[in-house]
Amino acid sequence: MRIPVYKSVYLYLTHACNANCSFCYRRGLFERNKVSSLGPVKMSKQTADDILDFCFSKLQLAPKFTIYFWGGEPTVNFEVIRHVMERFPQMIFHMNTNGALIDERMYEFFSRHRNIGITWSFGNCYEKYGGPQGKAEAEPWMLKLVRENPNHNVNFMVVEYGKLKEDFDFIARNITRNITIDLATRHDHSREDLERFAAQYFELLIEHEKDAELFQTLNPALHSNAYVREFGLKAQVREFHFCRTGLERLFIDTEGGIWQCDNMYICRHNRLGSVYDGIDYSKLDYVWEIDENREKYLGRFCESCELYKRCPRNKCLGLNLEHMGNMFDPEPGYCAMNKVLAKVIDKYIQLEKEKREGVHV
């Protein structure tokens, strides 16, 4: 039985959320289970203390161990966030938030504590506010927080495909240059929409190519196996990505139950234990086996795919299990997103090759 070294723990602070976004992953949890069966709506301060006491006394932790505040909307349970951060001021924290509940009191607290990185999710900007500008104007304290601290970032979940370039430029000019672009995994993207996304994404790459800081954040090729295979150290390439669920991070629910990750929690699959009873590490044996034999497991169902052995994003075992009933059978919508992202990467790699060949002529 092997014991992992953990890089992070996710504290699932609450089931509650103020936004009710159409693409939210929590929908899968509540469609499968009665809320009353999922433990307290909010994590208590005592449970949070018990969780972190367990982590620091029982787990093997990496040097830069990070505590993530998760939900639901984490700021619904701000009192526990404040309690944990004040009790462990030496730790590194991160939080994802839709930003709507950030008020002056929270702004002042997070401004004083520079050991937390905050991701402001813009996924609901069209659904709730008509676009990025409307969201920024509606959430002034969150806007101020992100503008003042370059460690905070915006995660822009694209649903208006033809406006990607316009919206990205608005965020970069008016909010922050620390931006990640993503596509919702629980949204039905049409082929035409994904093609429009790919075209605008490539335009952004070319527009910001000489802006080293922004380009590093924006460019998917720099973080893909395909790019490393062409221009980097081939020894760094792993042909089948997956998140090593349960081997690097843990997800802990509102009553102290320990799960491999948030998607496995949604599926109620393979609960590892609790902070009160400990972890049964033998339940992770199959993940070690997958990690050591990636092609055997992660390549299953994929042999005929054009992206076989070069898929640009992680295979999400929990997402597959939730939607397909088999953790190795890729969810079709996720495959479609990977294919359009690969198209952008391949196009950029070809451009890079042509430039490098031109230099050597």
Language model regions located:
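C-terminal accessory region of radical SAM enzymes
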Residues: 199-232, 262-312
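Canonical Radical SAM [4Fe-4S] cluster-binding loop centered on the CxxxCxxC motif
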Residues: 2-46
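Radical SAM/AdoMet-radical enzyme domain recognition
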Residues: 48-70, 77-193
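Short, small/polar residue-rich loop motifs at catalytic or cofactor-binding pockets
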Residues: 242-247
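Cys/His-rich metal-chelating microdomains
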Residues: 16, 20, 24-27, 264, ...
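Radical SAM enzyme core and accessory elements
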Residues: 1, 297-361
